[in-house]
Amino acid sequence: MKYDVSVVGFGDNVVDIYTHENVQYPGGNCVNLAVYAKMFGAKRCAYMGYFGTDKNADHVISALREEQIELVKCKKIEGENGYSRCTLEDGDRVFLDYNEGGVRSRHIYDLDEFDLEYLAEFDLVHSGNYCYMESQLPKIKAAELP
């Protein structure tokens, strides 16, 4: 079933590396929103943000493409993609190490008029706590984005 709603996750993407299983999962709050919205039938789902240039970035990009998430406003920045190393203890995820978002923490996405026009095409624009987008919130508010 398709729902007449469009969503964009603007901000974080990471790879969760589960050390006890030697397996990696793409994620991040904004990536997860786009993927789950698509799974539940949203008509248009996008992710907008920065990726690094390493294998972790390639893993997230590949997974998003497989899920048919729109990536047209993403950019690659030379360097390490966001990651966290974690394990499970008694069924709970325990974080061991992370790189503070990789390139995203050092290169803040600076929204221009074209980015704001793109975001205005969506019914919902989502960002999260670890996105390093706080400086962009006044622009989003001024543009009256949903």
Where are these regions (language model features)?
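Short, glycine/charged-enriched secondary-structure capping and boundary segments
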Residues: 22-25, 61-63, 139-142
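Conserved N-terminal subdomain of the carbohydrate kinase-like
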Residues: 15-20, 43-127
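Conserved beta-alpha-beta core of the PfkB/ribokinase-like small-molecule kinase fold
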Residues: 124-146
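Short, conserved loop/turn and helix-capping segments at secondary-structure boundaries
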Residues: 24-28, 113
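Histidine-anchored nucleotide/phosphate-binding helix
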Residues: 29-39, 143-144
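Short amphipathic alpha-helices and their capping/turn segments at secondary-structure boundaries
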Residues: 1-4, 115-117, 139-142
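Positively charged, low-complexity intrinsically disordered leader regions
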Residues: 1-24
